[in-house]
Amino acid sequence: MKHSYDTYRLYSDEKIFTFSVRVKVTMKEEVDIDVLRHAVNVAIRRYPYFAVEVVLGDDGGYDLAANNREVVVMDTPSKLPLLGSEEVNRHLLYIDFKGRDIYFNISHSMCGGKGILPWVMTNVYQYVVEKYGVMPDAPGIRKPDSPLLDGEDDEPSLDMLSDEEPIYKYKSKKPVVMLMDYLNGMYNPFKRDPHYYFFTFEQSDIMSFAKDNDASVASFFLVALAKALDKVLPEKFEVIGGEIAHNPAADIGMPNSHSDFLTHAHIDYERKYFDYDMEKLGTLTRSQIILQTDPSVSCYQLRRHFSFLEEVDKVQGTKEKRTFYGKNDPHSGKEAEHGTFIVNYTGRMDWGEVADYVESYAAIVDGHLLLEVTSMADKIFVTFMQLIKKNVYVDAFCKVMDELDIKYKLEGPYPNIRPKVKLPK
């Protein structure tokens, strides 16, 4: 690829969907903005690949250039400024806060959950160090003065990928894709209302249940949401489809890369499957995830995507590249494979003693019936995103948890408001 891998998602049209991530970290005490501002600008030194701004290359393509200006930290405004704007010193990230809540805003082009987590954790670590005058034991957190991990700033390329035949090719059973919900959530001003609910679970409850039912954290929430939708969707929809993202970085020799290159596993649940017990559903789900995250399958999916990006490189002109990207993106065209819902699990975050200062962690993105699951200390946090305010789905999800005797705390709904990006022309 001619340009940084971290730039290509910037060609996406943000008229409807916003391609940024907003992470909400709730501290146990009120946030001190002066300490936070200093801590954030110490922490960014650890992440030079995030301290960048967008510039135009000679072919009109987006490039990233070093940006040594201050990372902006502000009180949460009534309207969030654009990423890449002068208001945020042209950075593709900034921080705002209100009360005990710290919001980390970053372009999804530069990273996904795997890349965002270390940056957020370093910021919170440094804030705790400066605010409380302590040195918390947190070996899982990358310290501001620590060197980059081997390959942390490396980016993938087509020649890294194996060309062996995939051991498995997913064949869609044509699950329902909630078309009316999406149409209302995207185009109907009277129905569109992006928001999220926030769940807190005891990690021990989920892990114990998963262990007893041949499940993992990810497969548990896939099955739980599928069962919830089975309660409320008409019988005419014969298949409910779950989807989960997978980061195959280790499969291509880049286990420490910050870049957001993902593949997806699909689990199609025929309605008769919901007569199965939780153990059988867990086995079915995990077996599909294992098959579809095999390195041969991941490389097959990535080759298709990287080949598309190399076609973008051949187009001259910024406007022309954006048009080509929009018309040919394999993730959004007619051949794209979509499920009914998505569950993403970023894994357990080892905050060490820093967790003593943190109440909760929420990852907020665009989506409908999209769950972002994270784990910290003894808790599991779930953000439940929707494009329209329709309580029936979250109510059914709660009912499933009640039937499984899984305790939870539910908060929200909260508005899902995230910044768009301003790009050079």
Where are these regions (language model features)?
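Non-catalytic, low-complexity flexible loops and terminal extensions
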Residues: M1-D6, K98, M110-P118, T122-S208, ...
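Acyl-thioester-dependent acyl-group transfer interface
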Residues: M1-G60, N67-Y94, K231-K425
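Acyl activation and transfer enzymes in specialized metabolism, enriched
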Residues: K28-Y47, N105-M121, H195-P234, V343, ...
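A generic "functional-site adjacency" signal
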Residues: E30, R142, S146-G151, A215, ...
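Conserved catalytic core of two-metal-ion nucleotidyltransferases
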Residues: D63-A65, K143-P144
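Short, well-ordered loop/turn elements at secondary-structure boundaries
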Residues: F97-G99, D212, E337-H338
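Short acidic, glycine/Ser/Thr-rich loop/turn "cap" segments at secondary-structure junctions
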Residues: G99-M110, H266-E270
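Alpha-helical scaffolds flanking conserved acidic
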Residues: I102, V217-A218, V239-I240
